[in-house]
Amino acid sequence: MKDMSAAETDAAAGLAGATPRRRARPAVTVQYGVPRAGLPARASLERWARVALRRTADVTVRFVGAAEGRALNRRYRGRDYATNVLTFAYSAAGRALAGDIVLCAPVVAREARDQGKPVAAHFAHLVVHGLLHLQGYDHAGDEDAQRMEAAEKRILGKLGFSDPYGREG
């Protein structure tokens, strides 16, 4: 997927010609704990955040390798393996959203390959997934999971990506 201008992004998100509304102003910090080749650029991450967030946010996105991903998952979730994405929310009630999204680059790349998806689409899905967690979405129960998946599909569609679950509708 090519990088789009702000106007193209707004048009893709259904915002062009719409009644002006206050848009989220995400402050996105990017940390690369692994080589950058093949990873999303800051401009892409900012665009995804702009479309996914409903309010102002301060988000750090960190790309890590398998060892760091495994250590974080073990420390914070008690699971001794590298997972694709971890989200850490720091927001207090009534304050701007704040949090970290950690993506384990080799796990995301492997999953994309195994699922026959473009790597960029899988990164976009997992960043949106993390941004939804920062906004209070969860997938612990069936109803919550359905609500979160619907939001992911809607946002990714606005960004020009297909259904990450491979289902139509």
Tell what function each PLM region has.
Residues M1-A124, L134-G169:
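An acidic/histidine-cluster motif and surrounding catalytic segment
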